[in-house]
């Protein structure tokens, strides 16, 4: 993303948080950025396009930070605690983004915005699901969807207290609090043999496919990026790279993927300078998913 685009996004975000999306004009955003209205439209064809870019920008930024945390050698619990800490740090660093979403009637309910929000929620839920199953195993399996909703709900209330009411809690402390609450919920639900309020299948019908081991939306977006870049290459190795990605995708979808094949195909992709960065990021994401 170009620096000017980042400037427009971050400036618009502050204005949306202060005045609301509907009450902020393109002219005001341009003026605050010290650019002309015409220059604004060079980067974004409409205010709605700006909003979609804004949502995707902060989504990618947040999950990239989470997935770049060093967790090698950590237990699943320690890794999840680190990831929650960074998640909360990122949210608190971007209070304007949260304020914009909390402002009543701030965001337009268009199909594009709804799909973007659905993608973000799906990715967030899948992140929690994989972590819960890695930590608690079969004990949490019947309750994964319900636990995700409870984690998101509790986190939101606590973060609103910190952002709107001035409660001072370190992100690491909040992560500890949430982990303790999860322990209590898993223990209580499993010991009572509760019937889940919502199943994983029901949650999938609302937010898109949610399963243990399914590639998360960020992984899928990197695979798509690799595919697009391979298709745009005009080299003798394009066919071989395309075949490597085909084999990699097929192996990732298996219930028990073979690590040697995964490593081999990613190695083939990293040999291309144009694909190396995406391939390395994909390698890291798959490690995080214990593939």
Curated annotation (Swiss-Prot):
Residues 25-44 bind DNA. GO terms for cellular component: protein-DNA complex. Residues 2-62 form the HTH tetR-type domain. The lineage of its organism: Bacteria, Bacillati, Bacillota, Bacilli, Bacillales. It comes from Bacillus subtilis (strain 168). The gene is yuxN. Keywords: DNA-binding, Repressor, Transcription, Transcription regulation. The keyword Repressor applies. The keyword Transcription regulation applies. InterPro entries: DNA-bd_HTH_TetR-type_CS, Homeodomain-like_sf, HTH-type_Tx_Regulator, HTH_TetR. This is Uncharacterized HTH-type transcriptional regulator YuxN. GO terms for molecular function: DNA binding; DNA-binding transcription factor activity. Pfam families: TetR_N. Transmembrane segments: none annotated.
């Amino acid at each position: 993303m170009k620096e000017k685009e980042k400037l427009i996004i971050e400036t618009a975000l502050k204005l949306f948080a202060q005045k609301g999306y509907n009450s902020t004009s393109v002219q005001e955003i341009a003026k605050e950025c010290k650019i002309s209205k015409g220059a604004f439209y060079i980067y974004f064809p409409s205010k709605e396009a700006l909003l979609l870019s804004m949502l995707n920008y902060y989504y990618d930024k947040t999950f990239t930070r989470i997935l770049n945390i060093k967790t090698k050698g950590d237990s699943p619990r320690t890794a999840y605690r680190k990831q929650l800490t960074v998640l909360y740090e990122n949210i608190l660093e971007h209070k304007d983004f949260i304020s914009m979403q909390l402002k009543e009637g701030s965001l337009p309910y268009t199909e594009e915005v709804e799909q973007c929000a659905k993608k973000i929620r799906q990715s967030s839920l899948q992140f929690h699901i994989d972590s819960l199953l890695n930590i608690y195993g079969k004990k949490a399996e019947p309750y994964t969807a319900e636990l995700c909703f409870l984690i998101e709900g509790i986190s939101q209330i606590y973060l609103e207290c910190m952002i709107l009411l001035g409660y001072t809690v370190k992100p690491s402390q909040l992560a500890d609090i949430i982990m303790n609450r999860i322990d209590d919920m898993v223990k209580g639900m499993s010991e009572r043999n509760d019937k889940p309020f919502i199943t994983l299948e029901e949650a999938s019908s609302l937010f898109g496919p949610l399963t243990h081991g399914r590639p998360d939306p960020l992984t899928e977006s990197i695979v798509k990026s690799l595919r697009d870049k391979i298709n745009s290459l005009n080299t003798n190795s394009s066919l071989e790279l395309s075949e490597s990605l085909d084999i990699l995708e097929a192996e990732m979808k298996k219930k028990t993927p073979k690590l040697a094949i995964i490593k081999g195909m990613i190695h083939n992709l990293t040999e291309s300078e144009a694909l190396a960065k995406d391939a390395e990021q994909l390698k890291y994401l798959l490690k995080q998913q214990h593939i």
